[in-house]
Each structure stands twice: as C-alpha cells, then as structure tokens.
Amino acid sequence: MPRYVVQQHFRDAEDWHFDLMLERGEALVTFSSGVPPDRTEGLPCLVRHLGDHRLAYLEQEGEISRGRGWCRIHDRGTFEWLLPPGGEGIGQADEIRVRLAGQAARGTYRLVRESKTGADYWRLRKVTEKA
C-alpha cells in the first residue's frame, strides 16, 4: 500500500498551512490546504497542487531547509488510489479519489479540479460512505 502524510508547515504563528502528500512511485503528489483532511467541518475546501516532493518528506519533522520555517507531522498512514487507478495520469485528470487509512483521516476523499481558478487548484471533500 502506498503511504501518505499530512504535515503542518509554519513560518511563524500567523503563517501556516497543511500539506497532504500522496506516494506515487518515487515522489509525493502534494496538495497545500488551510485545513487537514481529518477536520471534516472545514471541508470542502480549496487546495493547491504543488510540485512533487521527495519521499523523505514522509518522515520530515523540524526545521525546513533554506529558511522556509519548520513542520510537524499531523497525520500519516496508508492509502489506496481509487481514481485514477494507481494514480496514473494525474496531470490530465479532473478528479482524484483516494481512500485514506491513517491515524486521524479515515475514509474516501475526492479532489476535483477547479476549472475557474486554473490547473493548480482543486476542491477537497470527504465522500460520505453508504452503509
């Protein structure tokens, strides 16, 4: 199973965000958000797709190089790529679905590309599972 991590990044007390990083091959597909996925009262929310990050970020905590602040791990676990299968073709996809199995975030999450805001912005929401 691929791994994921949610890091909380801080530059100072007023400048912080969360990064959701999803393992795909030798890199982490990364989205920046104002709320972590486990805080469902903050969802849906707009997230920004960042460049891929190194796998080392799965374990990264503490100071970030080049004076970019510091980070702590908010959540981690494994996940399953539901759409697109295996995470292949994300660059062309308009929708991504993953099933997270972490310490805090559990369940299916959907990211839908926001056509009005440009290719880098997506809407993140938790999918309600039918019983």
Regions from the language model: what does each represent?
Residues 1-131:
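A charge-rich, low-complexity, intrinsically flexible signal that marks solvent-exposed coils, linkers
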